[in-house]
Design a protein with these regions (language model features):
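Alpha-helical multi-pass transmembrane bundles of energy-transducing inner-membrane proteins
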Residues: 94-101, 105-179
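Transmembrane helix-loop-helix hairpins at membrane boundaries of multipass inner-membrane proteins
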Residues: 1-98
Length: 179
């Protein structure tokens, strides 16, 4: 149930930042999100081996990646605030909404126990990074964004196609073991 709360809280934070026209409010929400992510990682560690929402499990490799992400969240959020100091409030908020989305999607991908769910979250991270690349809205950023989305989406789609072929080769019983 805590995983669902984490996902819903991330959505609420994004909506609140979108509606906020205040830089200090956005900074406060980003600090709160960082603490929430660290708390979620601790919760996941305390519930090792538990499956939530059918498609997410707190296992060793996923927890390791989740903790690394939690360690990186604080300096990334701090740097994002410094990097966007001179940006207008709209760009400042778009950057931080995209950052929350990216961290949330990465967390979901790390703990996913189903290949389709993993693929969905991996593709979602691509879109969140695209928003981070294009938050300045320049011509160079637009070119970089569409190239990034094209290359990543094709690569992720081909990887998922390979997973589907493996599931057809090994049959339905062994397809569950691919997850």
């Amino acid at each position: 149930m805590s995983l669902l709360l984490f996902f819903i809280s991330a959505i609420i934070f994004c909506i609140a930042i979108f509606l906020a026209g205040n830089r200090k409010f956005t900074i406060a929400l980003m600090a709160l999100f960082s603490l929430m992510h660290i708390s979620f990682s601790i919760y996941a560690w305390m519930n090792r081996g538990v499956t939530e929402l059918t498609y997410f499990s707190y296992n060793g490799p996923g927890l390791l990646m989740l903790f690394i992400l939690s360690v990186l969240v604080i300096p990334v959020v701090y740097h994002g605030i410094i990097y966007n100091t001179k940006s207008d409030i709209k760009r400042f908020n778009i950057y931080h909404i995209s950052l929350i989305a990216l961290i949330t999607f990465m967390s979901g991908a790390y703990i996913a126990n189903n290949m389709t769910v993993l693929w969905i979250f991996a593709e979602a991270t691509t879109l969140a990074v695209a928003a981070l690349i294009y938050h300045d809205r320049t011509d160079v950023a637009l070119e970089a964004t569409w190239k990034y989305v094209f290359v990543c989406s094709v690569g992720i789609a081909l990887a998922y196609l390979g997973i589907l072929f493996l599931s057809f080769i090994y049959g339905k019983e062994d397809a569950a073991n691919l997850s």
